Amino acid sequence: MSGDIEKNGTVKDADIDNNVSSNDANSVSAEKFADVISTVDTGTDGANDVCGGTLYLVSTPIGNLADLSSRAIKVLREADFIAAEDTRRTGRLLAAIGVKQPMTSYHEHNKKESGERIIKRLMAGESCALCTDAGVPGISDPGADLVALCAGRGIPVVCIPGPCAAITALAVSGADTHRFVFEGFLPTEAKQRQSRLAELSREERTAVIYESPHRLKKTLSELRSACGGSCKITLCRELTKLNEEVIRTDLDGAVSIYSEREPRGEYVLVLHGADNKKTSISDWSCITVAEHVAFYEAEGLSRMEAIKAVARDRGVSKGIIYKELIK
């Protein structure tokens, strides 16, 4: 299948990592953006009020500063303090919108200690705005643990919706969007990775996967081995930025494209459902138990994992499958 490559050369790029501006004529400068948001009506009916003792999950741009909502700006301005995955990166965002609220660090490596400190401040009546580097806190980013702590203490949590790379990619993918599963980043540990790839090979729903440029080629090759070269995939790169690119192809085409070019930027992969994949496990009734187990072993599962998978497919216990194998 030939690749359908769609490049967006008119997306306004205001990359926060590049001082929140660009020299391109289509970019949104921090100054112009500040002028725009100063005129935004953030509501006076009380629905947008920032309340004490509340955690706010503030969605931030995934590449284009203009995607930051007026409600998000209001919360960042009025919260007592801001918890940030990376205080330097969030600091650049805050500078662009003229916000000078105090910040504290909350990330994957300090979330236990920092989380308890944030909880104490929330219980004392302060309001906190949680920001990650990009997108919605808790979605493949720090935040879920803090929300769980709040839930356990009866602390209100409010999400301020906004940009999300997974949903943005899904929307432009051309795949079935009625049912989908978010995988995030695939495991790096070999056994877990092979098990996840085997699951994807029989997944009927559209699957959304995050990948970094230095692992993209390996992941595409492994997906092709697991799902078959004819399985459709949409690759989304640099979403919402000036060099946004959407490639609609199949896994054979994707591997071919990236054999001739080096990946650049962060990727969202949208893998189409199991009806496009090389083998349908719904055909198990036509094969023997041994053949069924061999299928999963060929997909990278260990003997025991394969037996568990076959037992699940056939609705019987692992013991029955094991006895059938040793007959």
What are these regions (language model features)?
Residues S2-G9, E31-H109:
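Glycine-rich, flexible N-terminal cofactor/catalytic loop recognition
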Residues N110-I118:
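Glycine-rich, highly charged phosphate/nucleotide-binding loops
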Residues A84-E85, D141, Y210:
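Short beta-strand scaffold positions
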Residues P142-L146, R303:
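Glycine-centered tight-turn and secondary-structure capping sites
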Residues L76-I82, G154-V158, T206-A207:
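Short active-site oxyanion
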Residues D145-E203:
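Class I SAM-dependent methyltransferase SAM-binding "motif I" and its flanking Rossmann-like core
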Residues S2-D4, N8, F33, G52, ...:
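A contiguous loop/helix-start segment that scaffolds small-molecule binding in enzyme catalytic cores
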Residues T54-L55, E126-C128, T206:
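Loop/turn-to-beta-strand initiation segments
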